Amino acid sequence: MNKIKEGANVRITIYSPEVYTYGAMLIGGILKHKGYNVHLVRKIDKTLFLKSDVIIFSLYSTLHILDKNIREAIDFIKKVRKNKTKVYVAGCVSTYPEIILNELNVDGVIVGEGEITTPKIIEGDKEGLAYKEGDEIVINYPKEKPDLNHPLPLIPKDIEQQSIRGANVYIETHRGCLGNCTFCQVPKFFGKTIRSRDVEDVVEEVKAFKRAGAKRIAISGGTGSLYAFKKSINRDKFFELLEKVSEVIGKNNLSVPDMRVDYVDEEILEAIKNYTIGWVFYGIESGSDKILKDMKKGTNREKNLDAIKLAKDCGVKVAGSFIVAYPTETEMDYLLTKDFIVDAELDDVFVSIAEPIPTTELCDLVLSMPKEENLLYKMHEGEYRKLGLSEAEARCFDLLIHAEMWKSMPKPLTPQLYNLYLNEARIQGKDIRAITDLLFKYRDLLLKK
């Protein structure tokens, strides 16, 4: 691999589709700290691409691999710049480099966490890089995981215009997850050991984002209360983190939304009430204990309801995320989820059709069953049959409408809201079918992993 010229003479562009992800900003900051000329964009900019020596496509969804605009941009760069511009893919999609290298005309895939390896790869090293050598695919996995001490991220000038669930940015406080959820990639990508940043480093970063114009900040590492976790929850460190960040940005501009029901208690919820906007987002997923067991959630219906009640008793608002059309979900399981929503009276609800992400158990399950048994490919024959929905789309649509009626503050189901939810279900179905079709193309490869 040819070594690229060094330092400020090297023009690097990082492209993060639609959203400036934290990972893209982080790698941008590390490369800038090393003296490189770095641009971070969230829209395809062919003029900038043609002036770049290195372009990193920081992708966070399997859907990006299929994105026509991304494919065309990569082909355009390779056609015009030949070998003058190196094109890499990075991000959480890097756990399946074989698919990327077969689908996209790129020089390589930066595998896993890229803080240590990305600067080395730009200098010509191959550690942490997957690439094609003739007809063979070579995958060099990183030798070590980075600690989380790093320079400030590269913060875009228009960061205040970005909104991710109401926040301008999600700042990472820790990595890793103790869970075993079958649909989640986090333990595979970041590991099961919790690695946490120093409170002071997080605070300095929040100050930098505030100076750059960010008004609303969320902090997360998958499950907020696992910050500084060793053998048990470190409440003192978690409270210190919330208090100090809140002092900088203000409690009405800080959220720590992502929580597991088995890692909250009254003290943690009181801290969330006192130092943040006062919301938690629980990944509830299903009202069926059988499905929760199939998903390896480590919780059940009763624990979920108890955690919701506890939060409400503490004056904290609760949003719940649900997954429909999990491969083993029956009609009865789905009805139990509807019953759960009635009992829970959540303040907000998010509904997703089960998405197979490569390297997860859910992906293996989807690829191991005939497509015609997948609810994404079965036509709905019930009350919405005139809408031409798959069974998965119908459950998504139905649950969105049902949840709206049973929220703590329900909205009337206007034609506009009806069409909004119908469109949401259709888009999810279309996208996840496209992903599933792609994964079936690599079925044998993925089931071997």
Curated annotation (Swiss-Prot):
Residues holding [4Fe-4S] cluster: C177, C181, C184
Name of the protein this chain belongs to: Putative methylthiotransferase MJ0865
Radical SAM core domain boundaries: 163-390
Keyword 4Fe-4S: yes
Keywords in alphabetical order: 4Fe-4S, Iron, Iron-sulfur, Metal-binding, S-adenosyl-L-methionine, Transferase
EC annotation from Swiss-Prot or TrEMBL: 2.-.-.-
Cofactor binding, note field: Binds 1 [4Fe-4S] cluster. The cluster is coordinated with 3 cysteines and an exchangeable S-adenosyl-L-methionine.
MF terms (GO), sorted A to Z: 4 iron, 4 sulfur cluster binding; metal ion binding; transferase activity
InterPro entries: CHP04014_B12-bd/rSAM (IPR023979), Elp3/MiaA/NifB-like_rSAM (IPR006638), Methylthiotransferase_CS (IPR020612), rSAM (IPR007197), rSAM_horseshoe (IPR023404), Tetrapyrrole_Bchl_Biosynth_MTs (IPR051198)
Domain of life: Archaea
Cofactor(s) the protein needs: [4Fe-4S] cluster
Protein family (similarity comment): Belongs to the methylthiotransferase family.
